[in-house]
Amino acid sequence: MNIFKRIKAEIVYSLAVRNADNAHSENGERYYVMPSEDGRLVVVDRRNFSILKRKNYIPKDASVADMQRECFYCTPYRNGKGEMPADIIALKHSAFLDWFAKR
């Protein structure tokens, strides 16, 4: 990946993480940064995940565990537990960069 694509990828990732953190600070829900089929990042919580499943935007057999496994970032739970460790965040960030380079 050249430097300009890398800079764009870092900006896209940081904006998605900031949007997830802002949404979490508003109501305390856990938010996930997920890839979409059109090559963008979406910030989704569990409630919207189930709505998207109901409308068949997401396969019916997808679960919250799948969402946690495939997300690039997630906020902690309302009580503060479940925060992603720094090494997992770095691993997910590198997975995002690989995904961004392939799209």
Feature roles, as predicted:
Residues 2-103:
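Acidic/polar low-complexity segments and flexible, solvent-exposed patches
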